[in-house]
C-alpha cells in the first residue's frame, strides 16, 4: 500500500512517473537497454536529454537569453559553485538571509570572496518572514545578490521578486521550482536540486543568463564551470543520466496536468487547507508571517510538545509519514510538493482535528 509521503526531500513522486519508469526499467522503448545502461553520448540518451531540456524550457518559459544546465552537487554544492562562477571580476556578493539554507549559502561564499548581509528575516521567534525589498541594504556594486526563494526548514517563501537593475539576482529555488510560474527574466541565475519537485536526487538544474557565463574565478573546477558545461551541452563529464530521465518524465507529467498555472492553483488549495487547520486551532501553531508562508513546506508545532511522538505514531498508523520537523527547529513539517495529492492533505487535516480532540 502506498502512503501519503510528506518528506521534505527526497520527496513524493507522481505515481504515474514511477509506473512508467518501472515499465521501462529493463527495456527503454525497444532499445533493449535500461536508461541506466546507456552511453550518455548515444542517440537514445541524447534524445531523452534534449526532450527534458525542451520541456523544462517550455514549462518555466525560460527566455532565449538563459541557458539550462544539468549539473551535479545539489543545492549545497551550488553554494560553492555560484561564487566560484560569479566572483571572478568582483569578489563580493550580497545575501538576503531568510532561513537555514540561505545561512549556509552566506557562510560558504565567504571562502571565495567578501560577503555582505543585505537583509535578514530572523526575529525573536526564529526565521519567520521574507524581508521586503525596502529593507534590503545593498553594498556598492556587488557581483550578485543571493536569495533562497523558499526555505524548506522554516517554511518561508518569497513571492515578491524585485528588479535589481544591473545587479544579478541569484535564487536558490530548490524546494519550490515548478510549483508555480516564475518570471525567469528577473534572475541572473536560478538553481534547484531535483529531489523536491523535479524528480529524484542526483541532478541539479541551473538556469543562467548567457552574459554571466564568463565570470568565473580561476580556481573553479572545469566540471563545475558554467561556461564549460554550457559549451558541452551539460556533457563535459558523464551526467546523472537516470536522474535526468526521471526529471524528463516529471516534466511531461506536469505538462499533462496543465502546466505550472494549474499546479499553482492546486498548491494554493492544498496549502490553504493546511494553514486554515492550523490557524483555526488552539493546539497547533505556525510562526511564519502569513505573507511569507511557504506553499510547499508547512511547519507547525503542537501546544503540548510531549505529544509529538504520539502524533507521529498515529499519523504513521493512518498511512502518513515523514511529518517530523527538521532537527534544528523541532515540531512537525508537512512538505506538500506537486506530487502530494489533495487527498493526502485532507487526510492529514482530518487526523490533526481528531488528534486535537483526543488531546483536549
Curated annotation (Swiss-Prot):
Pathway: Amino-acid biosynthesis; L-serine biosynthesis; L-serine from 3-phospho-D-glycerate: step 2/3; Cofactor biosynthesis; pyridoxine 5'-phosphate biosynthesis; pyridoxine 5'-phosphate from D-erythrose 4-phosphate: step 3/5. It is an enzyme of class 2 (transferase). GO terms for biological process: L-serine biosynthetic process; pyridoxine biosynthetic process. Pyridoxal 5'-phosphate binds at residues 101, 152, 172, 195, 237-238. Its cofactor is pyridoxal 5'-phosphate. It is found in: Cytoplasm. Pfam families: Aminotran_5. Keywords: Amino-acid biosynthesis, Aminotransferase, Cytoplasm, Pyridoxal phosphate, Pyridoxine biosynthesis, Serine biosynthesis, Transferase. One of its GO terms (molecular function) is O-phospho-L-serine:2-oxoglutarate aminotransferase activity. InterPro entries: Aminotrans_V_dom, Aminotrans_V_PyrdxlP_BS, Pser_aminoTfrase, PyrdxlP-dep_Trfase, PyrdxlP-dep_Trfase_major, PyrdxlP-dep_Trfase_small. The modification N6-(pyridoxal phosphate)lysine is found at residue 196. One of its GO terms (cellular component) is cytoplasm. It catalyses: O-phospho-L-serine + 2-oxoglutarate = 3-phosphooxypyruvate + L-glutamate; 4-(phosphooxy)-L-threonine + 2-oxoglutarate = (R)-3-hydroxy-2-oxo-4-phosphooxybutanoate + L-glutamate. Binds 1 pyridoxal phosphate per subunit. SUPFAM superfamilies: PLP-dependent transferases. L-glutamate binds at residue 41. Its EC number is 2.6.1.52. It comes from the Bacteria. HAMAP family: SerC_aminotrans_5. Belongs to the class-V pyridoxal-phosphate-dependent aminotransferase family. SerC subfamily. Homodimer. Catalyzes the reversible conversion of 3-phosphohydroxypyruvate to phosphoserine and of 3-hydroxy-2-oxo-4-phosphonooxybutanoate to phosphohydroxythreonine. This is Phosphoserine aminotransferase. The gene is serC.
